[in-house]
Amino acid sequence: SSSNVYVVADIELGADNRIWVGTRQNYLQTATDKGGGRIMYSDNGTTFTVAYSHTNQAGRVKVACAPSSAYTLYAVFEANGKVDTLIRTHNKGKTWISVSKPKDADTGIPGTDPSRGQAWYDLSLAVSPLDTTVVMAGFVDVFQTQNKGLAWLQVGKWSNNSGLANLSCAYVHADIHTFTFKPGSTECLIGTDGGIFYAPDVMDNMTNQAVIYEANNGFTVTQMYWGDISQTKGKDLMLAGAQDNGTNQLATSGLCNENMISGGDGGYCFISQTNDNKQIVSYVYNQFYSTTNNWTANAKIIDDATTGKFINPAVWDDLNGYLFTGKSKVTIYRNKLGTSATLATTVTVNGTAANGAPSAFCSSISSAGKTQLYVGTDVGKLYVTTDAVASAPTWKDITGSTGSAIPAGNISCIHRLRLSDTLFVTISNYGSTANILMSVDAGVSHCAEEVQLGTLGLNWLTGQ
């Protein structure tokens, strides 16, 4: 928390029990040098010495110690989200030697950055327990060197897209986070966004597609961003938007029976309350797809990869047929199922960017049959309109007044009880003065409702 300390990105233990640390930038530091790009070590856990300082003040650093030699280490540096530099030492950090960067065969991945701008996320190294010249490196894909980084071989591919289709190596899910060797062995587990992969021997012919296996049978660890369930009584039908594992449809009971509707990152998804064949799924930002025949055919209902949040909040009023999604700090998108994405309408919610971008929605049908829409923002503002499909909806700020207002923070959920003016709002920020708020007068005033939850950030609640 202090502005004069280094921030740790990685801690490793050398073969002689020396502690090695890779740093990242300390954003509490006001100076130009924020402490990133350092390799440090300690023999007592109290005093640390800088063994290497990146000249360009890089950010995140990952360190790999050779299990068979206390003298050999490798390190990789991130700068501005990209893979910047790889280095090695064979004298415990007294001198360092530059190592070449792997080049991914994927034509969509820059030749100078195998992380594709995600080195803040997918960055990993490991040295073989039996040979200090053999190193595994993970970014979007998996690489191996058997000569200290003089040359790299791509031994895993996430797809068969352009450039990868003709590459002879095993499928390994994108975004590599860790390698774990069995002590004294060349057996290796690989941790990815798609779970665990197993290499019985990393010294095997790694261009053989059969030498790395997916090892996720019964291992259900996929992170879900969003989901929906059929309202048809007794029917097994769900949609689930997963982190880097697509949007999946589950139409039979039990796990591992899913059908992937769309790939990449799945997000908000919906099943019609009255017709199971009508569904909506999403990819990142404002890329939403719809179907009216259970994915026999589909079309984009909103098509904008430049606006909205990465996992973009949305709500579908399928009784009136309209989808609403976050667009910018003052606007939302609106379009009707079955309508071309080119006809999506931009609707202004509030006139000042300081009031934040949409972060949560809630829709209900008024007694007049119109779409009543609530929009929460990422700075704690709450708005409502009684006719969201009007050509120019009229919005009311119902954040509340001093003493009974929603606190500043990210509104993560809005829930209105059926046939009631009772409204609940959750705030996802840790340390917020109130993280569950209730209004019994449709938003005129709000009061804190959590009991014994402290300052936990909350993402969701539901009720009748």
Give the ranges of each region predicted by the language model.
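Beta-propeller blade termini and top-face loops
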Residues: 1-464
